[in-house]
């Protein structure tokens, strides 16, 4: 007969009328009983005959998350001009005095951050903006492009100008090597132009280079590109540098990222013959290569012959402006839109500063798309950047690990009678600058509108840009595109032209889609908080990622602290969002928990999710293990607040590990339901002296409670860890002490998931809220009783217990200003010093 919930509760000793613990508890360690219960609760049998359930409430399988919804009204969030001060260490030192080694190391890590991937895979520009919303492709393209433009304007992205130079907006850092600004009318230029026309001898390209550049701002890129670059050069070192630049530029520039800016590009004014000769024939050698590699974006409408017939006037290689002179092909021809405006503005924009960068190809390394900013804010969009290539495959980067305080440490730290407020750091990731050397690895961008549209509507016809007839220009005209562009014209106006061009952008601040970023952000905020705690000794400052909380004794004190700390952070260049500052009173909401003087509980929205989860949980139906992963994720978060904790979820974990479907029996569901509907706070540990000790051997157990000694034997020999756990349970139930000394590391770790299931559940409830102190076997007063010797008394140890705060040190003492004595070197081994109990 299946086990009823009442019986099961009684079995787990969760009811009060259980028999003496010394008899009842060892039974739960019995393997036979555990198997019988598992069979009764239907935990172990993978019933494959019934089809699996793939959806429970909102939980679907791990990889089929909810489909994002496109919102045509999305606005990109506004980014303040974020510029973290480069001398942040000095500024902190002026404020607090010398920094600790730890703080210095962390702040140096992010000034600037560096990124060294093992291998970078370059993707074609078409993959720059992901076709995430096929119905709203054009709209999504422009919204994303606008978002990228906003980021570039805010100084968060670099724009690739040429293979070796990039431009950006905002204040430069010292590690960004600026290219010197020089006007291109220098005496070398004239002779160079006339000389080139001599070499090219077919057409008067030379003299009209500049006029043409003025007219279209991007003439025939490959031809003029290398000539129109009158630019910084030390003639000695040029030879080495020009070769690669000019040669690469043919395959690269047409993709539109680098339109030539006379005042800034990294080739030189003294181009020598070979380079020029290459330019002369480039249109013959490269137009074929380009169209096959699919990168001749801006170049594709120009028949190869046109290079020779330049007397006919300027040729617009700009896809958008070409519509101006063509006849409309239909009512929905783009010509109608292009003729709406006389002046569409420049084809490209250039940043305020130009810097040298490592060689950067005209490719992207990750795709981007837009989603809602968060579930509560659907009016603003958020850019999702997919740099997952760095986390996959054999060449993946192993990201650094960093310590996050566990629940108990967090409670010990923050559970107090302080008043709290939390600060909101706006765009926290975008505070941390990246070294330009990382730019070639973190590229995003787009191939320009014509390519994007062509790729989406590729109706099996091969889009061949080789023979650029006028008909090809109108291939992209369609009713959908026309309607979308008309609507977008209202929003973006003449920016439509700018956004329809290709662009390649690299990150200047750390992006969110790289595993390095959370680590760097955590280092940054924890170092800042450490400095704040020292500067304001009466303030508790603590951070997790971009969530910074401040605590103080009284509300008035908190407000004055808030003002001075905000000013301090602003002086470092950290942007706070004053509208989002939350004042919590005495119970702090942090990391999904509510933390008050009574301890910690999960936040209300999580309790609500738990209730919904149990309401939707089907009984006697096999549930796909991927859905179980989702369920366990939620239940695992709240497990420490239940009676039986994690051990209660062990059957689910086992099932997921073996990739089997899991069937909830009514009793197991009722058991879990009861567990999760009554949550108990996790209390803060208090420091104290340990007076109660437990020890066990496989056959017996012994306790030392104050000056009393007790012992007992087990009916059958048990594994040593199980015996030690039982002894600890007896010590707790006999003495009621919250502090118990034990010499077993497994009991000490308070992870009871590896014990027999029933015993783990029961022990978790008995030992809930107990702290353990390690005592070496040789000094354990309970050692003798456990071996059956009651007569021998070892002296009771005075073992102090200090609550753990994990690896978060709240009390970093500022280093004293060093004296000028040489530091002594110690050769004594730390291991030979007399051992003291921790």
UniProtKB/Swiss-Prot annotation:
Catalytic activity: DNA(n) + a 2'-deoxyribonucleoside 5'-triphosphate = DNA(n+1) + diphosphate; Endonucleolytic cleavage to 5'-phosphomonoester
This protein's record includes keyword S-adenosyl-L-methionine: no
Activity regulation, short description: Activated by host HSP70 and HSP40 in vitro to be able to bind the epsilon loop of the pgRNA. Because deletion of the RNase H region renders the protein partly chaperone-independent, the chaperones may be needed indirectly to relieve occlusion of the RNA-binding site by this domain. Inhibited by several reverse-transcriptase inhibitors: Lamivudine, Adefovir and Entecavir.
Chain intervals for the UniProt region annotation (Terminal protein domain (TP)): 1-177
Positions with biased composition (Polar residues): 285-294
Annotated region (Polymerase/reverse transcriptase domain (RT)), positions in chain: 342-685
Residues holding Mg(2+): 424, 546-547
Gene3D superfamilies, A to Z: 3.30.70.270
GO function terms (MF aspect): DNA binding; DNA-directed DNA polymerase activity; metal ion binding; RNA-directed DNA polymerase activity; RNA-DNA hybrid ribonuclease activity
Listed EC numbers: 2.7.7.7, 2.7.7.49, 3.1.26.4
InterPro entries: DNA/RNA_pol_sf, DNApol_viral_C, DNApol_viral_N, HBV_DPOL, Rev_trsase/Diguanyl_cyclase, RT_dom, Viral_Replic_Matur_Polypro
Misc. remarks from the entry: Hepadnaviral virions contain probably just one P protein molecule per particle.
Family, similarity comment: Belongs to the hepadnaviridae P protein family.
Protein name: Protein P
Species, as recorded: Hepatitis B virus genotype C subtype adr (isolate Japan/A4/1994) (HBV-C)
């Amino acid at each position: 007969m299946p086990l009823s919930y009442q019986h099961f509760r009684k079995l787990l000793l969760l009811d009060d009328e259980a028999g003496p613990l010394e008899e009842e508890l060892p039974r739960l360690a019995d393997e036979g009983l555990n198997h019988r219960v598992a069979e009764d609760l239907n935990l172990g049998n993978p019933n494959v005959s019934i089809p699996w359930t793939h959806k429970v409430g909102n939980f679907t399988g791990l990889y089929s998350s909810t489909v994002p919804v496109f919102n045509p009204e999305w606005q990109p969030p506004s980014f303040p001009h974020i510029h973290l001060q480069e001398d942040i260490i000095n500024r902190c030192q002026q404020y607090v005095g010398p920094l600790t080694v730890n703080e210095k190391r962390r702040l140096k890590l992010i000034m600037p951050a560096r990124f060294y991937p093992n291998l970078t895979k370059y993707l074609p520009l078409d993959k720059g903006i992901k076709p995430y919303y096929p119905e709203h492709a054009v709209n999504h393209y422009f919204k994303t492009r606008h978002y990228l433009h906003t980021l570039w304007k805010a100084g968060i992205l670099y724009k690739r100008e040429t293979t070796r130079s990039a431009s950006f907006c905002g204040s430069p850092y010292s590690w960004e090597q600026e290219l010197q600004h020089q006007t291109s009318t220098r005496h070398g230029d004239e002779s160079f132009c006339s000389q080139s026309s001599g070499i090219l001898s077919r057409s008067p390209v030379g003299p009209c280079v500049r006029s043409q550049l003025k007219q279209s701002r991007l003439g025939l890129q490959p031809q003029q590109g290398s000539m129109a670059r009158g630019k910084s050069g030390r003639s000695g070192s040029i030879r080495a540098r020009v070769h690669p630049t000019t040669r690469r530029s043919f395959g690269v520039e047409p993709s539109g990222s680098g339109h030539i800016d006379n005042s800034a590009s990294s080739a030189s004014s003294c181009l020598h013959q070979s380079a020029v000769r290459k330019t002369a024939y480039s249109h013959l050698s490269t137009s074929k290569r380009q169209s096959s590699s699919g990168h001749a974006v801006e170049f594709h409408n120009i028949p190869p012959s046109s290079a020779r017939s330049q007397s006919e006037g300027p040729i617009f290689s700009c896809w958008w402006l070409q519509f101006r002179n063509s006849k409309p092909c239909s009512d929905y021809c783009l010509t109608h839109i292009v003729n709406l405006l006389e002046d569409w503005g420049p084809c490209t924009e250039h940043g305020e500063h130009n810097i040298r960068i490592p060689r950067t190809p005209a490719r992207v390394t990750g795709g981007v798309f837009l989603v809602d900013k968060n579930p509560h804010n659907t009016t603003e969009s958020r850019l999702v950047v997919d740099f997952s290539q760095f986390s996959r495959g054999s060449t993946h980067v192993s990201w650094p690990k960093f310590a996050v305080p566990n629940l108990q440490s967090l409670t010990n730290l923050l559970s107090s009678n302080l008043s709290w407020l939390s600060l909101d750091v706006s765009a926290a990731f975008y505070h941390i600058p990246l070294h330009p050397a990382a730019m070639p690895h973190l590229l995003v961008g787009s191939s320009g509108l014509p390519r994007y549209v062509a790729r989406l509507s590729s109706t099996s016809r091969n889009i061949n840009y080789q023979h650029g007839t006028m008909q090809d220009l109108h291939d992209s005209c369609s009713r959908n595109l026309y309607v979308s562009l008309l609507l977008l014209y209202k929003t973006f106006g003449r920016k439509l032209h700018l956004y329809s061009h290709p662009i390649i952008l690299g990150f200047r601040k750390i992006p969110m889609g790289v595993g390095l970023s959370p680590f760097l952000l955590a280092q940054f905020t924890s170092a800042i908080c450490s400095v704040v705690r020292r500067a304001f000794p009466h303030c508790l400052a603590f951070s997790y990622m971009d969530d910074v909380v401040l605590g103080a004794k009284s509300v008035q004190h908190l407000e004055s602290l808030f003002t001075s700390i905000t000013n301090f952070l602003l002086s470092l260049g950290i942007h706070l969002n004053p509208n989002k500052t939350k004042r919590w009173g005495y119970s702090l909401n942090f990391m999904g928990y509510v933390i008050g003087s009574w301890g910690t509980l999960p936040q209300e929205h999580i309790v609500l999710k738990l209730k919904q989860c149990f309401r939707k949980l089907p009984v006697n139906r096999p549930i796909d293990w991927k859905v179980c992963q989702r369920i366990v994720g939620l239940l695992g978060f709240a497990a420490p607040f239940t009676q039986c904790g994690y051990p209660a979820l062990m059957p689910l974990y086992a099932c997921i590990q073996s990739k089997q479907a899991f069937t909830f029996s009514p009793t197991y569901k009722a058991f879990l339901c009861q567990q999760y509907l009554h949550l108990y706070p996790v209390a803060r540990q208090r420091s104290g002296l340990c007076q109660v000790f437990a020890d066990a051997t496989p056959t017996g157990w012994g306790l030392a409670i104050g000056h009393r000694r007790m012992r007992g034997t087990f009916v059958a020999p048990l594994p040593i860890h199980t015996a030690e756990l039982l002894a600890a349970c007896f010590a707790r139930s006999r003495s009621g002490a919250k502090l118990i000394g034990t010499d077993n590391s497994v009991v000490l770790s308070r992870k009871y998931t590896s014990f027999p299931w029933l015993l783990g559940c029961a022990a978790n409830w008995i030992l809930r809220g107990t702290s353990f102190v390690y005592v070496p076997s040789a000094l354990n007063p309970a050692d003798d009783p456990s071996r059956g010797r009651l007569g021998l008394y070892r002296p009771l140890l005075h073992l102090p217990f200090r609550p753990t705060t994990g690896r978060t040190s709240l009390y970093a003492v500022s280093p004293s200003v060093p004296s000028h004595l040489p530091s002594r070197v110690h050769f004594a081994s730390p291991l030979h010093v007399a051992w003291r109990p921790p």
